[in-house]
Amino acid sequence: NDELKKVIMNYYYKEQIEYVFYDTLKTDTANIGVPEEIKRTATILSNLAQNFNLYICSTLQLAESDTLPVNLDVNDLAVSRTVKEVLDTLCLIKQINRDTLKNYEYSLKEVDTKFYDLKKYDDPDVRYYACVVDKNRAGAKPTLVFRLNLAYNVWNELGYLRLKQ
């Protein structure tokens, strides 16, 4: 944690960074297996973000589960669930299985009467992801759907996802 803070502050002062992307938030090596340490690391990042007006984005791993992508919640995190307490926003993202695309539909507005099916592409590089906004201190908590083309690393937000009624 001390090293992480030192690295971020070094770049902040030398390069005037405004954004930090931290791949897979986890505890420092001395505290592997201590669930509360992940919350401590998240608190350090949150304090840096607030005190230095930084945008800090991090990923967390989901636990292996059979939870449908639209039903994800904080209990699907592989790490300590208490990390949610210190986050401003928590988005849980999971790939929608190609074989279950027919079970989902999306709309362009959160409250809508027109829905669209998820198109099944022959190209295996085209995939869909559900994004459940589990926490948002700034407002709404929708469930969104994104289409990703892995070949070009292009993400398209399609709209609001739901299971077909």
Go through each PLM region and give its residues.
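C-terminal regions of RecA-like/P-loop NTPase motor modules
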Residues: 1-20, 44-52, 65-165
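Structural recognition of the conserved hydrophobic beta-strand(s) that form the central parallel beta-sheet
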Residues: 21-22, 54-61
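Conserved P-loop NTPase "ATPase switch" module shared by AAA+ and STAND
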Residues: 15-31
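A short alpha/beta connector and helix-capping loop motif
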Residues: 32-48, 56, 91
